[in-house]
A protein has these predicted regions:
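Acidic, Ser/Thr-rich peripheral helices and adjacent loops at domain boundaries
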Residues: 478-513
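Active-site phosphate/pyrophosphate-binding segments
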Residues: 276, 283-479, 484, 504, ...
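Gly/Ser/Thr-rich loops at beta-strand to alpha-helix junctions
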Residues: 78-82, 203-214, 266-274, 311-313, ...
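Extended, charge-enriched "interface" segments that sit outside catalytic cores
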Residues: 49-195, 558, 594-598
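Short, Lys/Arg-enriched N-terminal segments with co-localized hydrophobic residues
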Residues: 31-43
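N-terminal small/polar loop signature for handling phosphorylated ligands or for N-terminal nucleophile
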Residues: 170-192, 197, 242-257, 264, ...
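Anionic-ligand anchoring segments at beta-strand to alpha-helix junctions in alpha/beta enzyme folds, i.e.
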Residues: 197-257, 279, 401, 405-441
């Protein structure tokens, strides 16, 4: 009786879907013609929570949670359903990306509701606004154009952006040409250090998007045949944390005579970055003084370069303005890996040629995202599923599980891309959201994660997961006498884990297997844990660019659906302000033994304890 009643609830949601499709748009939801122009010029649409699809999806989600017949073990037994929940993207040369989301807790009808909701909130128009350079980052009055960084020379961007398209793309390629020329001089030995030694060590100083994205790409290419060959004899390291331990570990075995420091800061005022830059400057000057070089100005000019927009502060630091590589206000930090922020240090390590292939891969997905129909669009599908899991199924976390050790820093980068973008409390026009946006992202490469946090995923909280695997290994190994290659062993787990999460193992299964009664409940796997599987051909520079762009655009899609601004980050400001107050107190107390003033009792007590400590 209960199941029948629950089924009626579910089918009422599907009935509502049919009613929505049959009814005129102006009778159920604000028509497209009612969309208005935001004061900054971006197109706004109705909020997702104001659409009838939102209500229908809430109803469907409640039923999905309650109805045993909608358990994934039953949904996945429907071959037709599973075949309909797969998307394929193929590029020249036979490269494939297969996205299988049949193990998500969705049906064809639920996906139709999601597509219809996307239509009502103007997803396509918002996507086009981004493509054409409208100022969709309205709180900062900026366009969002990281996709332009990947456009090849000769691309006719003026078709999309008649007013500024050609100028913007010309500027992008002027910087890229400058990077290529400088990198060629360093890698060929034409640009040497002050002692005449070639510069083979690269210390990249930056934090947040200036570090996480480039570091992900560095690690992803480390075992690639072409990239590793190009990197022979060179090493790139990232210095982000202001903790002096990070600086010590980064530089302790480097020769300053062979080291080039890359300082990355848009404003050249980022507190942590500039303190590390000054520390590196002193390290270079002191280290080279020990080798008989005393011209500090010449040391800085030959051993320090900058990625910044603040030429006056860069030159004041002592850096040759010809060794400054710019970018633009329309490049957000977490989306900047394809700008000089990432391309300068990564080209020094792997060559400009390899990084051009990376940019080509990202551009390939940009074109797919902007052109492909929504139902075949990989970032759109991932974004809609993310909205379903977060907003309707109320799952607050997402695991990123790349079955490739090369992607060990990928989850950390996407953690910033997604959480800094979509962790917002109000819509783009300042209205509090009626639900929580964003997800808590975390992950580790498989199979390492299986021996760490998968226990919770299988028998604890429900955590939607993205499995990412590759048909080819960067370093194939096949040992004589083993039944499978090392890569096949890895991929065996890639294919098995989503099924284990979806199907689980029941009490009756355990009884049939003869498991002792006292252990049966401990060994039950409830299953019904959602995941998507993305299988790509190979992880080279092009493939890494594809993967990056898929997840960047996935994040934007979710923000578009939620009607939030995914491209600002006001949430990072308050802590900076408070840290400035603490910094001032520490300075005063260290110099004059002044007592702690102006803080709450808890912080005051901790500060007093910190200041009173004697080594």
């Amino acid at each position: 009786m209960k199941l029948r009643r629950e089924a009626l609830v579910f089918f009422s949601a599907i009935s509502l879907l049919k009613d929505i499709k049959a009814s005129s748009s102006d009778s159920l939801v604000t028509d497209y013609s009612s969309r208005y122009q935001h004061s900054k010029g971006t197109t706004m649409s109705v909020k997702c929570s104001d659409t009838p699809q939102f209500l229908a999806l809430q109803t469907a989600a409640e039923q999905m949670k309650m109805d045993e017949k909608l358990h994934l073990k039953h949904l996945c037994s429907d071959a037709a359903r599973c075949a309909g929940l797969v998307a394929n993207h193929e590029t020249e040369g036979g490269r494939k990306i297969i996205l299988d989301y049949s193990r998500q807790q969705v049906t064809g009808e639920i996906m139709e509701l999601l597509f219809d909701m996307a239509d009502k909130v103007g997803l396509v128009d918002k996507r086009n606004d981004m493509r054409c350079g409208k100022k969709i980052n309205s709180t900062e009055g900026r366009a969002v154009l990281h996709h332009v960084l990947r456009m090849p020379k000769g691309y006719d961007y003026s078709v999309r952006n008649p007013a500024e398209g050609k100028k913007i793309l010309d500027e992008v390629h002027a910087v890229r040409d400058k990077i290529e020329a400088f990198v060629s001089k360093v890698r060929s030995g034409e640009h040497k250090g002050v002692t005449g030694k070639e510069l083979k060590n690269f210390v990249c100083i930056g934090i947040g998007g200036s570090q996480l994205g480039p570091e992900f790409v560095l690690e992803a290419l480390r075992a690639d045949a072409k990239a590793s060959q190009a990197a022979m004899g060179r090493q790139l390291r990232f210095l982000a944390n202001v903790d002096p331990v990070d600086f010590n570990v980064c530089t302790r075995d480097l020769d300053p005579a062979e080291t080039l420091v890359v300082v990355i800061s848009k404003t050249f005022t980022t507190a942590e970055t500039m303190l590390n830059a000054r520390t590196a400057k002193k390290w270079l000057i002191d280290g080279l003084a020990d080798q008989g070089i005393v011209d500090a100005d010449d040391i800085v000019k030959k051993h320090v370069i900058a990625v910044s927009t603040a030429e006056d502060l860069v030159t004041e630091f002592g850096i040759d303005k010809n060794n400054m590589f710019g970018f633009w206000e329309w490049v957000g930090g977490r989306f900047s890996v394809c700008s000089a922020v990432g391309i300068v240090p990564l080209s020094l390590q792997y060559s400009y040629e390899v990084m051009s292939e990376f940019l080509d891969g990202a551009h390939c997905i940009d074109e797919h995202f902007f052109e492909a129909p929504l139902r075949e669009n990989l970032p759109v599908l991932l974004g809609l599923i993310g909205v379903w899991n977060s907003t309707f199924m109320c799952y607050g976390t997402r695991a990123l599980l790349p079955y490739s050790q090369a992607l060990k820093r990928f989850p950390a980068h996407i953690q910033q891309v997604d959480m800094e973008s979509n962790g917002k409390r109000v819509t783009i026009d300042g209205v509090p959201l009626p639900f929580q946006s964003g997800e808590v992202d975390f992950g580790e490469p498989g199979t390492n994660g299986q021996h760490s946090f998968y226990q919770l995923m299988h028998q604890g909280r429900v955590v939607p997961a993205d499995f990412i695997g590759f048909m080819e290994s960067q370093t194939p190994v096949e040992l004589q006498g083993e039944i499978v290659s090392n890569h096949d062993e890895l991929m065996s787990n890639f294919f098995a884990q989503p099924d284990a999460l979806a199907y689980g193992k029941s009490l009756s299964d355990l009884i049939q297997e003869g498991v002792p009664e006292n252990l049966r409940e401990h060994k039950v796997f409830m299953g019904n844990r959602p995941s998507s599987s993305m299988l790509m051909t190979k992880l080279d520079a092009f493939g890494i660019g594809q993967l990056l762009a898929i997840y960047e655009h996935r994040t934007a899609v979710q923000g578009f659906i939620w009607s939030i601004n995914s491209f600002d980050q006001w949430g990072v400001e308050l802590g900076k302000v408070l840290a400035k107050q603490v910094r001032s107190q520490l300075n005063t107390s260290r110099k004059s033994q002044a007592s702690v003033q102006g803080f709450n009792s808890s912080t005051s007590a901790l500060l007093e304890a910190y200041l009173s400590h004697k080594k």
